[in-house]
Amino acid sequence: MKLMIFTGLVLFAIVSLIEAQAENEKPCLPEYKVRTHAPGNCCSDLVCDCYGRYKSGAQIGRNCFCLQKGVIYKREN
């Protein structure tokens, strides 16, 4: 009986530890993934770049994107 209780407690502790680690590990965001309001955690080969959105001169929001490192993006007309 004691062995069953001990085994149950050990299994409970292991499952709790695994769940806690899974919550702490955030998956990285892939290329061109949009995250609003705050920079996200982009994958290691990417960089987070944020832009403000304006309407009639007032900022209405902010978007952050995961983009390739070292690549320059230009606006096309």
Swiss-Prot record:
The keyword Disulfide bond applies. Keywords: Disulfide bond, Secreted, Signal, Toxin. It comes from the Eukaryota. Its main location: secreted. Contains 4 disulfide bonds. GO terms for cellular component: extracellular region. Residues 21-26 form a propeptide. Disulfide bonds: none annotated. InterPro entries: Spider_toxin_CSTX_knottin. Residues 1-20 form the signal peptide. One of its GO terms (molecular function) is toxin activity. Expressed by the venom gland. It is found in: Secreted. Belongs to the neurotoxin 19 (CSTX) family. 08 (U8-Lctx) subfamily. This is U8-lycotoxin-Ls1l. It comes from Lycosa singoriensis. The lineage of its organism: Eukaryota, Metazoa, Ecdysozoa, Arthropoda, Chelicerata.
